[in-house]
Amino acid sequence: MSRKISAIAIIGFALLVVLGTVHQAMAQAAAAPSPATPYSKMAPIDQYLMADRAAEIALARSAAPESISRDAEVMILGRHGFETAVKGKNGFACAVGRSWTSTVDAEFWNPKVRVPACVNAAAARSYLLRVTKETEWGLAGRTPAQMNAAIAAAIARKELPPMEPGAMCYMMSKEGYGGDSVPHWPSHLMFFYSDTDLASWGANLPGSPVIGVSDSVEHLTQFVVVVQRWSDGTEYREGPAAEHHH
């Protein structure tokens, strides 16, 4: 049993395919990842961590404009899960996602993945709980199949709540690393719902700026809208995300 491809990862590929920066073959690889991968097992935990605490805080905050992220709670990854590094004042929470929640199956154990995100209060009380739980499981060495079963069971037992109204996320960072297949994503916003019809947003229709993905296992619907600026205020153009290197 293979773990489902992360909805965020699918969206990452969809964004770049729509913008013409990823070849069709790469998108197909996301849909059916090859079992031949350099990330067939968990790397040493230290490779998933960032030794520079200040650098991880700054990377997490880069997900949203400074006017939002400066007063947000910031979480950094410890050996057993996310830990609060900075207390927030405005209800937002920022963190740097790792491979277990941010990439495709073939890169489930890729220790290089770093995906900055800032969620609002509604998402912090719903969507973020799933991310933190999956991160704990990943650090504990759960296999993709085990994690897939665990998240479904936790939702069925109502240990993880449905999405709160208004739950959303800023992913506007120039920094980070989305994985070897699609290293850099466009600047975008995400909106989270529980079991919502994609058609209600006109998602994925010709000419629509809205990308949508529904996950029946997690009863989660995610909508994405690309925005025209990075979090630092500079203009987003097709290409810089793909050309930006670390």
Kindly label every feature range from the protein language model:
Residues 25-31:
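Boundary at the C-terminal end of the N-terminal hydrophobic targeting segment
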Residues 10-21:
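Bacterial N-terminal signal peptides
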Residues 31-246:
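Primary mode marks residue(s) on the alpha4-beta5-alpha5 output face of response regulator receiver
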Residues 1-12:
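Bacterial N-terminal signal peptides that target proteins for export
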